[in-house]
C-alpha cells in the first residue's frame, strides 16, 4: 500500500493529520518514499556530521511546490520508526529554498506525547529548538555542494494555510 495516496482524506485535516515518518530523530540516513511503489528507499547518508533533529516525514495526500508530498518534522520525546503513522497537529512551518526551489517544512507535534503536546505554536517552544532546526537545514547539504537558505519560521496559522494549499494541489494533480 502506498501511504502517500491511501490514507482516507477524513483523517487528514489541516489541524489534525497523520504524518508518515520516513526518518527517525538522530539519524544520518536520508530515506524517501518511492513515489511509484510507496516503499521506503535510502536516498543517501548525510555527508555532514549533523543528524536529523526531529522525526521527519510527509503528510499524505499533499503536493508541495518542490514536487513531493509536503514535508513534516514531528517533534517528539522519542524516536519514531520509519513508516509509522503519527497523529499530529501543526505548530509552525520553516520556509526555505533548496537548490533554488521553495521547500516548506511543517513543524508538528503528536497528540499523544505529553512532553510536547502542551505547545500550540512554534513561538511557545524554547528558542533553541527552532534554532537547532534552522541550523540543520542550513548545513545538512553543504558538503554535497548544494545550497539551502532558511528564510522564515512562521506560526501555526501559516502552517495550516500551507497544508490546505498542498492538499488542494494534490487534489488538482491526482483527483481530477
Please annotate each region the language model reported.
Residues 1-176:
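Hydrophobic N-terminal alpha-helices or hydrophobic patches in metabolic proteins across all domains
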Amino acid at each position: 500500500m502506498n501511504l502517500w495516496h491511501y490514507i482516507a482524506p477524513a483523517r487528514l485535516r489541516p489541524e489534525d493529520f497523520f504524518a508518515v515518518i520516513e526518518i527517525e530523530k538522530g539519524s544520518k540516513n536520508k530515506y524517501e518514499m518511492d513515489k511509484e511503489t510507496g516503499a521506503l528507499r535510502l536516498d543517501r547518508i548525510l555527508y555532514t556530521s549533523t543528524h536529523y533533529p526531529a522525526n521527519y516525514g510527509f503528510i499524505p495526500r499533499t503536493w508541495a511546490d518542490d514536487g513531493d508530498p509536503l514535508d513534516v518534522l514531528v517533534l517528539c520525546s522519542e524516536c519514531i520508526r520509519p513508516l509509522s503513522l503519527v497523529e499530529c497537529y501543526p505548530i509552525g512551518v520553516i520556509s526555505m529554498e533548496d537548490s533554488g526551489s521553495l521547500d516548506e517544512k511543517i513543524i508538528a507535534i503528536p497528540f499523544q506525547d505529553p512532553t510536547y503536546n502542551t505547545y500550540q505554536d512554534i513561538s511557545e517552544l524554547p528558542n533553541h529548538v527552532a534554532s537547532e532546526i534552522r541550523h540543520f537545514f542550513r548545513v545538512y547539504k553543504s558538503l554535497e555542494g548544494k545550497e539551502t537558505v532558511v528564510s522564515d519560521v512562521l506560526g501555526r496559522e501559516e502552517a495550516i494555510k500551507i497544508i490546505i494549499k498542498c492538499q488542494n494541489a494534490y487534489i488538482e494533480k491526482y483527483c481530477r
